[in-house]
Structures are given as C-alpha cells and as structure tokens.
A protein has these predicted regions:
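A generic structural signal for tightly packed, nonpolar segments enriched in small/aliphatic residues
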Residues: 190-486
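Short amphipathic alpha-helical segment within the helicase RecA-like ATPase core
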Residues: 1-254
Length: 486
C-alpha cells in the first residue's frame, strides 16, 4: 500500500472516498455539517456515518469516522480507526482514498503517523494464499491512501515510514503462523530465515540435525525426534557487539505443529496447533523490522524449531534428556515440549553476554485461563526490563501483564531423579513453566512472554486484528528496542 502525506483537509480533492476523522468536542466543517439532516454523528469512538457530498465538496463519498474524546485519544485508538477506514474502502471497492485528521492531538506527529500507518496496513491484511478462484471483489485490495493533516507534515511522514515497516514485519509473522503445517516445517522456517537474510543483510545460520547432535542440543533433538520433519536451530544476527550499544537476544519457540506427542492432545482444535511457532514468527518478524529500521543495537534472534509428533521414535514420558546446558530434564508430559526446546535456545543466548534476553512462546494454556486473549503474560528476573516491556505494551496496544516468578515456582520444577522435570502439577502452570525456563538464563536480565492467549484469535478482537494469527510480539519488541534504556 502506498501511503502519502499532504497538508490540508482533503475535502476539496477529487477522490472516490474521503475519510474524515472526527472527535466528540470538535465541530464538523460547516460544509460537512450541512450534509447531516440530524446531528446523529457525534464523533464517538469507531462511530461511522457515510455521506454522499454535494456542493463544494469534491469527494464522491465522505465517511465520518469517530475517534472519541480528544483527551482520551491513544495510538491504539488511531490504529483502530485507520483499520476501519481501509476496511470500509475495501468494502466499497475503492482503490485509493484519503484520510483527513484535523483534530489538534497532544500526541507527537510521528507517533500519530506510525499508528495510522500500522492501522492501515494491519487492517488491510487477509490470509488468502491458498484460496483459488477468488472473484475480483474477494481479492480486491486498497492500493493507496493519502493522509491529510494540519500537523507537521515531515514528522508525520517519518512516523508513517516507521509504521509501514513495523506493520509489514507483523504481517510477515502472521503469514508464517497462519501457514499450514505441511508447508511451514522446521526446514521451511530455516529457509524463510535465509531468505530474510538475503533481503535485509542479516547474518543467518541454520543448524541441522548433525550439527545439533555434535553441539549437544538435546532438548530440541528430543522434541523433534518423533517427526519426519527434522528440527532446526536458527540464528539471525544484526549489528555488531559494541561498547556503547547493548546486545539483546530474542528467543522464539518454533514448534511448527504440536500434537502433544505421546501425551497426545484431543482432536478438538488440534488444527490450530500450527500456530505453536508464533514465538518464532515474532522473532523473525522483529528481526526484519530491526534490519529495515537500522536500529543501533546488536540484536540476535534465536529460533528453536521442531515438530512434536507421536511415533515409534518419539520421546516418551519417563525419558531423561540432557540439554545444551548439561542440565538433565525428566519428561513427565511430552506436551510440555515448548520449555524443552527453549531450554537450549536460552542457554545458547548466554554466549553473547547480552544485556537482555527475551523469549516468546505459546507456552501454556494456564496463561489463557488467567489473562484471556487481551494480555500477554510476562515473567521476569529483572524489573527494569519488565517495566520497559510494560511501557512498550501500552504504546503498541500489545499489552503485557506481569506475573510472579518466585523461588517457589522454580523449586516446583525440581525432579527426584534429574535436575528438573518438565511439568509442575495442576496449579500455576504458566508460573512453574517460567520457573523451569529460569534455570537456563544464568544471571542475565531476562523476560519470558507467554503469548498462548494473544498469538491466535478465533474472531477479530480489534479492527486491525483479524481472526487467526495476530503477529503479536513484533510491534512490542520493536518498540522496546527503539526505546531501550530510555
């Protein structure tokens, strides 16, 4: 989508559709107000009124789109309104439209531009790769939007450029997580990473089973040993270590399909377990955005990719695994596989001596019970890092909620016959899972993001968030990296 920025109102520019964003306290332009037979458009948040102008107004159609009260406008509100605008344009089969925002917002123009661009790009997203025989109406896409503003045009343009970069990276992550498991295998994730490196200049290394065996990736190998699609460990590196810039490691769970293994899941909704690599997708998307934005930090993305299948060669309840760290793990439940692959990835991250390690994983159903689908669970060994993620969540709308990581949760994962066990009982499952992971991060500042409730939705929760994969984590992590240390 081409998004351009101009000064003015856009009400006198010929177009098939002009979208005028309105606020509750702001009067409509006189020539617009005259079109309303009753004062039924009050600018309430997400309120829409479609008009067919006459007189001096040039657009064929005019959509009034409410933003709510000026005092309560947030970047996420702008994001949602922009998504509604592009969806209305698509419904009307309008290829290019204008969006006018004349309200005097207290938000910086760059923030406004970024939020609007994200809303337009994310709101336009649809996953139709495997649809055949689509009609022109079904495949129709909006090609361009001109933003009209009374604010600083240059600053708004900077924000738009950033927003499009971040949104496209989010859509890349959505595509990976929406992809069918016969297509998105561990090898396919490795190929996607290599292609990403070719596009962006990221340095990419993909370790295959012989190298995993040689180097001792016992966790990833165990989870993947029951599948005909062998596991991979993927390293993506941006920038170089520097005395004046931090190194941050992002670790993603990449279980490309999770049957539960020998501890097999029920058939109901097992098809959705293709999204169990959403953490890996978020890492790949974030690394794309980091490279395209040219951020100053040294950032390393690590993807632990495996397929968890039941077979004669699958790992079993009762097995004891030796992980990359040398720590041993007693397997009580093969469906608690995410923490086992992450154990190798988190320990591997320590070799970079990072200022922060952040992992993302669709790890537990327990976090969904606790927080639903509106917040990602956050558990951390470092409060300063957690606070930065909380702020980034408020800015991006990818909100996180901090849960405790007390020593009792770590102790609950101790085994009688190995160093650790991979299941901690019925209660506090998200917390004991984090307690398990804590054993593999050393003394480095670390945050664990359990995205099991936010990575996939069965219905649209926000206009820019369609059903299916949400791409959660990309915008959150990019915001953290852009503001890191501030």
């Amino acid at each position: 989508m081409l998004i351009t920025v101009q000064n003015g109102t856009g009400l006198h520019a010929p177009t098939d559709l002009a979208v005028l964003v309105t606020c509750e306290e702001s009067p409509l332009p006189t020539e617009v107000a005259e079109l309303l037979e009753a004062t039924d458009h009050r600018g309430r948040f997400k309120q829409t009124t479609l008009l067919y102008p006459r007189g001096t107004l040039a657009p064929r159609r005019l959509l009034l789109l409410g933003l709510g009260k000026l005092a309560t406008v947030t970047p996420d509100g702008l994001r949602q309104v922009a998504a509604l605008a592009v969806q209305q344009a698509r419904e009307l089969q309008v290829a290019t439209c204008t969006l006018s925002l004349q309200a005097h917002l207290t938000l910086p123009p760059a923030v406004v531009g970024q939020a609007l661009a994200e809303g337009l790009e994310l709101g336009a997203y649809r996953y139709q790769r495997y649809k055949t025989g689509l009609s022109s109406e079904q495949s129709f896409a909006v090609e361009g939007v001109t933003l009209y503003t009374s604010a600083d045009e240059a600053a708004l343009h900077v924000g738009v450029t950033t927003g499009q970069t971040v949104a496209r990276a989010t859509c890349f992550a959505r595509d990976l997580a929406n992809g069918p498991p016969n297509s998105i295998t561990p090898a396919a994730l490795g190929q996607a990473a290599q292609e990403l490196g070719q596009r962006t200049g990221l340095r990419v290394t993909v370790l295959e089973p012989p190298q995993l065996v040689e180097q001792g990736f016992g966790g990833i190998l165990a989870v993947g040993q029951g599948s005909a699609n062998p596991p991979r460990f993927i390293v993506l590196e941006y920038g170089q270590p520097a005395a004046d810039q931090p190194t941050l490691c992002l670790v993603g769970k990449g279980v490309t399909f999770d049957t539960g293994g020998i501890s097999i899941k029920s058939a109901d909704k097992m098809d959705e377990m293709k999204m169990d690599m959403s953490g890996a997708a978020a890492v790949l998307g974030t690394m794309q955005a980091v490279a395209e934005l040219g951020l100053p930090q040294h950032v390393v993305g690590l993807v632990c990719a495996a397929e968890n299948m039941p077979s004669a060669t699958a790992y079993r309840p009762g097995d004891i695994i030796t992980t990359l760290s040398g720590k041993t793990v007693e397997v009580l439940n093969t469906d608690a596989e995410g923490r086992i692959v992450l154990a190798d990835g988190l320990f591997y991250a320590q070799r970079y001596k990072p200022q922060a390690i952040i992992d993302l994983a669709t790890l537990t159903g327990a976090i969904v019970v606790a927080l639903g689908q509106h917040a990602t669970g956050l558990m951390s060994s470092d409060q300063a890092l957690a606070d930065q993620l909380i702020r980034a969540g408020e800015t991006t709308g990818e909100r996180v909620w901090q849960m405790p990581l007390w020593s009792e949760y770590r102790e609950a994962m101790e085994s009688d016959i190995a160093d650790l066990k991979n299941a901690g009982g019925r209660y506090g499952g998200a917390l004991t899972a984090a307690g398990f992971l804590a054993a593999f991060v050393g003394d480095y500042p670390w945050c664990h993001l359990d995205i099991a409730g936010t990575a996939w939705v069965e219905r649209s929760l926000k206009p820019y968030q369609p059903w299916g994969a949400t791409g959660v984590g990309v915008r959150l992590l990019v915001e953290l990296l852009r503001s890191y240390g501030q």
